[in-house]
Amino acid sequence: MLEQTSYRVERISELIRRELTLLLKTTTKDPRLSGVMITDVLASRDLSSAKVFYTVTKEDRTVVEPILSKASGFFRSRLSKTLDLRHTPALGFIFDSASNTGARIEQLLSKL
């Protein structure tokens, strides 16, 4: 059975994605996070947690993953200051392998 998300949850997920992208560009000072791109955010229905999907352009995924996990509290506190929510969702960072798969398929198709 498909789980339907409400318009509010989708809207908040998009707001979180935009704010995290902005935070990564402006406030993080770690150069290893400069190649991180937020691809999608899926918030739970009760907005207690959010899965943040990301890709990496420069650094290795194994280097960036623990840094993002460690900085999730920092990102959550910054989001609580900018978003007008009663409770800010807990953030879980997940590597988005779908975008890499799509790029690989495009590369293979261009060779044909």
Curated annotation (Swiss-Prot):
Q: Can you name the source organism?
A: Ruthia magnifica subsp. Calyptogena magnifica
The task this protein performs is described as: One of several proteins that assist in the late maturation steps of the functional core of the 30S ribosomal subunit. Associates with free 30S ribosomal subunits (but not with 30S subunits that are part of 70S ribosomes or polysomes). Required for efficient processing of 16S rRNA. May interact with the 5'-terminal helix region of 16S rRNA.
* Keywords recorded for this protein, A-Z: Cytoplasm, Ribosome biogenesis
Q: Which PROSITE patterns match?
A: RBFA (PS01319)
Q: Entry's PANTHER family?
A: RIBOSOME-BINDING FACTOR A, CHLOROPLASTIC-RELATED (PTHR33515:SF1)
Output the GO biological process annotations, alphabetical, semicolon-separated. Answer: maturation of SSU-rRNA
Q: What is this protein called?
A: Ribosome-binding factor A
Family assignment from sequence similarity: Belongs to the RbfA family.
Cite the GO molecular-function annotations of the record. Answer: ribosomal small subunit binding
Q: Which Pfam families match?
A: RBFA (PF02033)
SUPFAM superfamilies assigned: Ribosome-binding factor A, RbfA
Coarsely, its chief localization is cytoplasm
Q: Which domain of life is it from?
A: Bacteria
**Localization terms from the record:** Cytoplasm
What disulfide bonds does the UniProt entry report for this chain? Answer: none
Quaternary structure and interacting proteins, as annotated: Monomer. Binds 30S ribosomal subunits, but not 50S ribosomal subunits or 70S ribosomes.
- CC annotations in GO: cytosol
